[in-house]
Amino acid sequence: MKQLFRQWYDLSEIKKELTTRNWFPATSGNISIKVSHEPLTFLITASGKDKTKTTPDDFLLVDHLGVPVLETELRPSAETILHTHIYNNTNAGCVLHVHTTDNNVITNLYSDAVTLQNQEIIKALDIWEEDATIHIPIIENHAHIPTLGENFRKHIQGDSGAVLIRNHGITVWGRDSFDAKKRLEAYEFLFQFHIKLLSIQGGVSNGANSYS
């Protein structure tokens, strides 16, 4: 029980911080944190809640299938399946899914992936090579959640990572809440920098890659 309370507090603090950045517009987004490994349980945001508010109903505890462990009227977020795929296939401890203008714009500029390189902040992703290059996959935003989940699952390759969903935000996971938040911040910085650089250079009309 102590672990549950500790993880609840940790997730609540992350929610507050990401809210101050307006990364949960119009109740969008969902976040989760692992509570136990055997059996697998994790806390996840309840569906349709205003994440700018802090209430006792912010999160609910679910199992490895995303089913509530305790009797509740709350519903887990619609994309809970993405979280279950991550927790069932990795040792990740926290998953963050947010919608920002920048990460949505990026998915409209590129088709299957966005490549970013030669930025110092890439080291926040535990990549230490000089002039490092990263590739972030982009998948289609299927309304059929099981299809979305299956396409997403194909890109889960370790205990930390990220996947962009076209016009539907980014999902980032890490070893724990600190690692996941650090990675999310790094990706959002890279997206913002990339878009600003394109605008200075003339954008897609002057040769930058585009997807439509």
Curated annotation (Swiss-Prot):
Keywords: Amino-acid biosynthesis, Lyase, Metal-binding, Methionine biosynthesis, Zinc. Zn(2+) binds at residues 97, 99. One of its GO terms (biological process) is L-methionine salvage from methylthioadenosine. InterPro entries: Aldolase_II/adducin_N (IPR001303), Aldolase_II/adducin_N_sf (IPR036409), MethylthioRu-1-P_deHdtase_MtnB (IPR017714). Binds 1 zinc ion per subunit. Its cofactor is Zn(2+). It catalyses: 5-(methylsulfanyl)-D-ribulose 1-phosphate = 5-methylsulfanyl-2,3-dioxopentyl phosphate + H2O. Pathway: Amino-acid biosynthesis; L-methionine biosynthesis via salvage pathway; L-methionine from S-methyl-5-thio-alpha-D-ribose 1-phosphate: step 2/6. The keyword Amino-acid biosynthesis applies. SUPFAM superfamilies: AraD/HMP-PK domain-like. The keyword Lyase applies. GO terms for cellular component: cytoplasm. Its EC number is 4.2.1.109. Homotetramer. Catalyzes the dehydration of methylthioribulose-1-phosphate (MTRu-1-P) into 2,3-diketo-5-methylthiopentyl-1-phosphate (DK-MTP-1-P). Belongs to the aldolase class II family. MtnB subfamily. NCBIfam families: PRK06754.1 (NF005244), salvage_mtnB (TIGR03328). This is Methylthioribulose-1-phosphate dehydratase. It comes from Bacillus cereus (strain AH187). The lineage of its organism: Bacteria, Bacillati, Bacillota, Bacilli, Bacillales.
